[in-house]
UniProtKB/Swiss-Prot annotation:
Belongs to the universal ribosomal protein uL14 family. SUPFAM superfamilies: Ribosomal protein L14. GO terms for molecular function: large ribosomal subunit rRNA binding; structural constituent of ribosome. Keywords: Ribonucleoprotein, Ribosomal protein, RNA-binding, rRNA-binding. It comes from Wolbachia pipientis subsp. Culex pipiens (strain wPip). The gene is rplN. This is Large ribosomal subunit protein uL14.
Amino acid sequence: MIQKNTLLEVADNSGARAVLCIGLLGGRKSASVGDTIIISTKSINPKGKVEKGKVYKAVVVRVKNSVKKSDGSVIRFSSNAVVLINDQGEPLGTRVFGPVKKLLSGSFMKIMSLADEVL
């Protein structure tokens, strides 16, 4: 579960390393895998596409909290991670690192195709 003021890792090569959740879209109190959130970059790679302190949108791809699959099994990741997206919902980076939970929304198919492993 991702709430406001949650520190998250970035799972793509957009240039951001760590981000802070500053808002949730849809009027929710918490976000899970596949939800879109508003983030602020806290630490960056100097050669990246993003700037420190700027506000971006991101989609949650991994959460520490257990997520049940349709067959009854449970998936739990070791970190909370996001992929930065633009206003059209396309990822800012060209690669996605680490495993990604299957995103049910059809608008994030590009993220699933860039991922190494989809669970």
